[in-house]
């Protein structure tokens, strides 16, 4: 039996409903077992999208990119140098990337501010929805996504769902080392993050199902 058949059989036995078991098995496989993203050759990339992963909180309350986002910025700048593609990235990645690229080729994405002037958390989905609200996704052409390795599959999948022609850059190793001092607790170690990522995948799928 295949992995999918085994999952369907288990869920069918648990739920007593073979039809629902098949549908649920497909969801479980996609949202909890799939940790790869479709890839594309680097020379085909026309736009680079960079997603932040955590940050560092200073003693005075200020936020800085931190080591993970600095590593992502290096990758974004390298890809931009190889392809000539512009970089559109959350500010934690855009700020250090701009220091590595000349000519204003990096466009930062900033979060909104609340009534106290504090930044409002901007989710992966929120980033992409904001970009799509301003600019048609198809206008970006082939999009190469730069993101933390465990975050990358969801970034690509979410972008594709919103109409971006998005891929992981082929042959480019994304950062894998978690920052134990991250200002976002779910970005400090792997197991909590993987659970967090699965939760978000399932939450977004639930929302889509309820929206009909």
Predicted regions located by residue number:
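A structural signal for short, hydrophobic/glycine-enriched beta-strand patches
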Residues: 2-5, 9-10, 14, 18-189
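C-terminal capping/extension of enzyme domains
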Residues: 176-212
């Amino acid at each position: 039996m295949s992995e999918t058949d085994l999952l369907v059989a288990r869920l069918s036995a648990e739920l007593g409903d073979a039809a629902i078991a098949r549908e649920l098995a497909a969801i479980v496989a996609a949202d909890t077992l799939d940790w790869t993203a479709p890839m594309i050759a680097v020379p085909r990339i026309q736009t680079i999208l960079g997603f932040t992963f955590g940050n560092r909180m200073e003693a005075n309350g200020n936020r800085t990119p931190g080591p993970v986002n600095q590593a992502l910025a290096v990758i974004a700048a390298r890809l931009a140098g190889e392809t000539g593609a512009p970089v559109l990235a959350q500010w934690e990645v855009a700020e250090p990337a701009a220091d590595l690229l000349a000519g204003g080729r990096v466009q930062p994405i900033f979060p909104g501010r609340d009534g106290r002037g504090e930044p409002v958390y901007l989710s992966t989905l929120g980033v992409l929805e904001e970009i799509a609200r301003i600019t048609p996704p198809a206008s970006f052409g082939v999009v190469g996504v730069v993101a933390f390795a465990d975050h990358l599959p969801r970034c690509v999948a979410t972008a594709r769902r919103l109409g971006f022609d998005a891929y992981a850059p082929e042959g480019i190793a994304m950062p894998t080392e978690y920052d134990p001092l991250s200002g976002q607790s779910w970005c400090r170690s792997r197991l909590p993050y993987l659970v967090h990522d699965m939760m978000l995948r399932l939450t977004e799928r639930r929302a889509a199902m309820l929206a009909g």
